[in-house]
Amino acid sequence: PSVIFKGADNTPYEKIGDEVRSLADEVPFDIPDSWEWVRLGNISSYAETKQKVNATSADPSIWGLDLEDIEKGGRLLEHKTVGERKAVGDKTVFAKGDILYSKLRPYLLKILVAPDDGICTPEIVPFRVYGVIDPNYIVNYLKSPYVDNLINSITYGVKMPRVGTETMTSLLVPVPP
């Protein structure tokens, strides 16, 4: 993990191991002195291996979330069970309170806090933030025009653009006190 701090010159620096480098060109905007910049990978489980389950062996009464159930902007449209959906294939397990982030076509901003436990398509990355950070704050930050523009400038794939794990874990997040 890295540590981000303000130097004597009042600009942000990042220390990784013994190496210190300036973040002056990477920090997108000023934040209040009491706030701090952190990397999403240091405050969340985004990069951790997710628990998988085959939908055919999952409890048919649990929620089975697909991308089409989430409207552009993150509003949940449908809440179908695995049985109702007749879901098949490998799915990712998530828990109530997890942030659900669609890595496929991220410009659609299909990001929300899970209202219940369930399983979802592997195109959705469930993750938790550590400590007392409100997941709704992170969801709103991820939907911000700054993050939206940044992520969409570095997606890969033409027909089905995706955002990579490294892009997300290195994302700078302003955290209030």
Give each language-model segment a name.
Residues 12-21, 41-44, 53-86:
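DNA target-recognition patches
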Residues 67, 165-168:
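ATP/adenylate-binding site constellation spanning eukaryotic-like Ser/Thr protein kinases
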Residues 1-27, 31:
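Intrinsic disorder at enzyme termini
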Residues 21-51, 174-177:
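Non-catalytic DNA-recognition/assembly elements of restriction-modification systems
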Residues 89-92, 96-147, 152-166:
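A short beta-sheet element
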Residues 31, 67, 113-114, 129, ...:
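Hydrophobic residues in beta-strands and at strand termini
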